[in-house]
């Protein structure tokens, strides 16, 4: 199968996306597919040969991809590589995607996980992995996601949204400590734990440097978990325990910063309940194929709370979803093949795509 793996782009999660894309590319190549790894923003300029021939070129498309740095990338430096750009799609990106049998989306964050590229591909008849444009857009905005959770009875922490420059009052249902989060950010970029009103003002100022709308959410004391869902069925639960602080950008991507345990050490009744909540969350949000739902388990009440859903979860070989698949005895390459095959089903007769 001819596959284009799309990664990179102009997002605070750019480095994570490139790392995911490199892993997916290598796995699909090992599986015998004809694969190209493309940076969706930089594209592939100055191509001399017919684009079709690139799928058979003896070339390591992942050779220039580096690991994930401790801090989010400098996007202005990335933009400078395409001076005067008007389109967020680089040279030959759409052309190569139109030639392949499937686009494997290794994108994360804005312009990749928010439904825009999915809508464009739907209009152009380009097949791609994962959820469609509507479900992707719903899940990209944490405020909308949480409203959907509440409307369908899925427990989620109390929260309010605050717009830049807007007056607000913190309800008693939230109080301190609380979490400040950008509504549409990912990889915990723009996420801060706040202990008091002075810290809240500082955290809001930082969060507003990323987006104009911010979520303030009750901080649930306890343990953090994540649950991948594939074709409506939950995988084994993984527990995430940072060595210090909370699960921020640094703790997510720097080796040795976090202890991750899969399957999580939980009573069977809590495991079943959380997996059911993850499956219900994906159904409510219109997830297609696969996703990952993040949870907190309250150490006082024993209740679990859904935080958000990730329609394109991290796919570096050490990311959470690959670890959950490994608990089922599935290799990373087998997981990538599974996602590819699951995504193909929506384009079969009777599927939900043209």
Feature names for model-found ranges:
Residues 35, 127-128, 156, 178, ...:
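Hydrophobic beta-strand scaffold residues
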Residues 119-128, 196, 201, 327-329:
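A glycine- and small-aliphatic-rich helix-loop capping segment at beta-alpha/alpha-beta transitions
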Residues 1-7, 11, 19, 90-97, ...:
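Active-site nucleotide/adenylate-binding loops and adjacent lid/helix of ATP-dependent enzymes
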Residues 195-276, 299, 303-305:
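Phosphate-binding site of ATP-dependent enzymes
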Residues 218, 227-229, 282-315, 325:
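Conserved metal-phosphate-binding beta-hairpin within the catalytic cores
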Residues 288, 303-354:
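C-terminal active-site "lid" helix and adjoining low-complexity regulatory extension at the edge
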Residues 1-134, 138-140, 144, 151, ...:
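ATP-binding N-terminal substructure of ATP-dependent carboxylate-amine bond-forming enzymes
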């Amino acid at each position: 199968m001819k596959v284009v793996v799309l990664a990179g782009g102009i997002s605070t999660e750019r480095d994570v996306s490139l790392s995911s894309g490199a892993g997916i590319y290598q796995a699909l190549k090992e599986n015998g597919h004809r694969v190209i790894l493309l940076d969706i923003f930089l594209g592939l300029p100055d191509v001399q040969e017919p684009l079709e021939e690139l799928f058979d070129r003896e070339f390591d498309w992942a050779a220039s991809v580096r690991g994930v740095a401790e801090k989010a990338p400098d996007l202005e430096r990335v933009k400078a590589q395409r001076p005067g750009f008007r389109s967020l799609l680089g040279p030959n990106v759409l052309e190569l995607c139109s030639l392949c049998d499937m686009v494997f989306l290794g994108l994360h964050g804005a312009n990749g996980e928010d439904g825009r590229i999915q809508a464009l591909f739907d209009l152009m008849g380009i097949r791609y992995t994962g959820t469609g444009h509507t479900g992707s857009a719903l899940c990209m905005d944490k405020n909308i996601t949480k409203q959907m959770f509440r409307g369908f009875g899925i427990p989620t922490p109390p929260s309010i949204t605050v717009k830049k420059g807007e007056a607000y009052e913190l309800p008693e249902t939230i109080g301190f400590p609380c979490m400040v989060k950008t509504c549409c950010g990912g990889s915990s970029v723009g996420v801060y734990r706040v202990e008091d009103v002075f810290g809240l003002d500082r955290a809001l100022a930082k969060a507003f440097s990323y987006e104009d709308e911010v979520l303030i959410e009750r901080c649930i004391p306890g343990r953090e978990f994540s649950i991948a869902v594939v074709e409506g069925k939950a995988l084994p639960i993984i527990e995430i325990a940072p060595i210090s602080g909370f699960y921020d950008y640094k703790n997510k991507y720097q080796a040795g910063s976090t202890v991750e345990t899969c399957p999580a050490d939980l009573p069977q009744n809590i495991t079943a309940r959380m997996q059911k909540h993850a499956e219900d969350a994906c159904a409510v949000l219109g997830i297609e194929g696969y996703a990952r739902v993040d949870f907190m388990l309250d150490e006082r009440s024993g209740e679990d709370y859904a935080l958000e859903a990730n329609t394109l979860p991290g796919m570096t070989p050490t990311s959470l979803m690959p670890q959950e698949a490994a608990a089922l005895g599935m290799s990373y390459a087998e997981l990538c093949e599974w996602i590819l095959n699951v995504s193909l089903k929506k384009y079969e007769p009777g599927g939900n795509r043209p």
